[in-house]
Structures are given as structure tokens and as C-alpha cells.
């Protein structure tokens, strides 16, 4: 005779953090945005395997997160970072020349900066390859998401940001590649379906049979690649600059973006204003080192400090958005 499982509910702003700290085998953090930081830290402190889909918690926490994690405790769920994890098994860390992070290019691939000025929220919500929520879809249109993924890759795999190349791959079949120092490049290919990286995240390094459908190799497959237009889509290089500055700069990049995406979706700012205003907030943050809202170095990073910087960046981004409207 089957009996219903005992269950209970958790409510309140710290409910996800309390849940993440409970004994279990794996915690999959799929929260969107900086709200995922505390559940990520709670999971790591509990010694539980963390299947990380919330890239923002790693990006904003930086060393707070990486130093809290035991070797192998964090498993990437983003398709690109899952691809890196699979490809990196083909060689030693000291044999890696660079990581090649692929990008569909979003719905506005091929447009110049001038042609992006009149993009509407409705247009930005139409991604060519993936079906996702509002924030991540807009982030994929501005390529802020690719900037966050660049930072995540550097932190997860200990690779210098200058050794991570972003290339546009409209087919979304090659999820990322690793180039080794002998000239070999190892790639991970599969249809654009999150079932595979989620399955790997839950049972890494084992593979779950039939987790997703494979490519049909009897049909034509788009393996076209092209360089990223950093003039039209400046978010990736802005993220790289934040990562090189280290400390709290990536947290400011993320926090400002979250506010500005909302402002764009509400029609208060334009599409180009998102990345341009993030850059203004980042520049102000770096110039304020030693003052409230100013840059924290890696050694100065604390949870309270990061949260304070996050709050400052949100307030400043909202002020600049209001001035733009």
C-alpha cells in the first residue's frame, strides 16, 4: 500500500537558503539573478553537491563562492559550461590553451549598433534557439548573458579571462570547445535542449541514458562560426573588464543589469541604454574605491560587503534609468 510522503512548507525571504542547507545528495540552484547567492553558499557550507544553473551567484560572489567549494563540489548546468566540463576531460589543465565559448548571436545577430537603437522589448524576447524566461532572454539579446558566462567559465575552470574566446555560432549545436596546446580542439555537440546538461548536473560525471535526443547526423547540420561584433554588443568585453578588475566589479555589472532589464521591458529606456548604463555604473563604482558603493578588492570581499555593493548598484542604475527616461 502506497502512502503519501511527509512534506512541509518553507516560506519567507530565506526559505530557499534554509532548503538548500538541508541534507540531500544534490541541490540544483536554478534561481534567476543575485537572489541565488545565499542558497549557493548554504549548499556549499552543507557539503552538498551544487548543480549550478544560477551563474549570477558565482559571478557576484567570486572568491567567496570558489573558496567555499570543495574540489568537484560545483557542477555546471549551463549548456556551455557543461560542455567545457566534458571537453576538459580530454586533457590536463596545463595542456589547455583556451576555452571557446559559443554564442547564438541572439535575435539581432548581424545588426550594427545604429540598427539596434530602436529594438523593442517584444523583439528582444524572440530568441532564435532557446525558450527561456524574460530576464535571461533579454540578457541573451544584449549578450549580457554571454558576459556572465565568460565570468563563470573563468571562475569555474581557473582559466584567465584573456584565454576565453567568444565566437558566434547561430546553429547552437556546438555548445562550447576547448583548444589544447597541441592544436587539437575538442567540442561538445548536441541539440539545443537543456535536458542533457541538467541530467549531467544531477549525476555528474555519470551519464543518464536517453536524457535527450541526439543530433540527426544524416541531415545537414549548421557548423558555421563568425566573430563577435563587440561594437554592437559591448556587454561581453565590459564583463571581461569587470572580471579583470575583480572583487565586487562583476556584482555591480550583474546588479545594474537586472534593474535596467526591468526598465527596458517597461519602456523607460532603450535597448542600447542597458549596456551603456551598466558601463556608467561600473565606472562610477571603480572610481569610488574606499567610499560607500566603491570597489572592493578580492581580499575585501564579504557577504555583507557584496550585498551592500549590490544595493548601491541597483539604486544608481535606477537613478540613471530615470534620468534617461
Predicted regions: what they are:
Residues 1-325:
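Catalytic, metal-anchored helix/loop core of enzyme active sites in primary metabolism
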Amino acid at each position: 500500500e502506497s502512502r503519501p510522503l511527509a512534506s512541509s512548507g518553507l516560506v519567507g525571504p530565506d526559505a530557499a537558503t534554509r532548503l538548500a542547507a538541508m541534507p540531500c545528495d544534490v541541490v540544483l540552484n536554478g534561481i534567476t539573478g543575485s537572489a541565488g547567492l545565499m542558497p549557493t553558499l548554504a549548499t556549499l557550507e552543507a557539503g552538498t553537491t551544487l548543480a549550478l544553473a544560477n551563474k549570477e551567484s558565482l559571478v557576484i560572489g567570486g572568491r567567496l563562492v570558489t573558496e567555499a567549494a570543495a574540489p568537484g563540489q560545483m557542477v555546471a548546468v549551463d549548456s556551455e559550461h557543461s560542455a567545457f566540463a566534458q571537453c576538459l576531460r580530454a586533457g590536463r589543465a596545463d595542456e589547455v590553451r583556451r576555452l571557446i565559448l559559443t554564442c547564438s548571436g541572439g535575435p539581432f545577430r548581424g545588426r550594427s549598433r545604429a540598427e539596434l537603437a530602436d529594438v523593442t522589448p517584444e523583439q528582444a524576447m524572440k530568441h532564435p534557439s532557446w525558450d527561456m524566461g524574460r530576464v535571461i532572454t533579454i540578457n541573451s539579446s544584449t549578450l549580457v548573458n554571454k558576459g556572465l558566462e565568460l565570468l563563470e567559465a573563468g571562475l569555474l575552470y581557473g582559466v584567465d579571462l584573456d584565454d576565453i574566446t567568444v565566437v558566434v555560432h547561430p546553429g547552437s549545436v556546438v555548445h562550447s570547445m576547448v583548444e589544447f596546446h597541441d592544436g587539437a580542439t575538442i567540442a561538445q555537440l548536441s541539440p539545443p535542449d537543456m535536458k542533457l546538461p541538467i541530467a549531467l548536473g544531477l549525476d555528474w560525471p555519470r551519464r543518464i541514458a536517453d536524457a535527450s535526443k541526439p543530433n540527426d547526423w544524416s541531415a545537414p547540420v549548421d557548423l558555421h562560426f563568425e566573430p563577435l561584433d563587440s561594437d554592437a554588443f559591448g556587454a561581453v568585453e565590459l564583463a571581461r573588464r569587470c572580471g579583470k578588475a575583480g572583487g565586487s566589479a562583476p556584482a555591480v555589472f550583474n546588479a545594474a543589469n537586472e534593474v535596467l532589464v526591468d526598465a527596458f521591458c517597461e519602456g523607460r529606456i532603450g535597448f542600447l541604454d542597458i549596456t551603456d548604463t551598466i558601463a556608467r555604473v561600473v565606472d562610477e563604482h571603480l572610481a569610488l574605491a574606499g567610499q560607500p558603493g566603491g570597489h572592493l578588492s578580492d581580499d575585501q570581499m564579504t557577504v555583507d560587503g557584496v550585498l551592500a555593493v549590490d544595493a548601491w548598484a541597483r539604486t544608481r542604475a535606477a537613478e540613471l534609468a530615470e534620468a534617461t527616461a
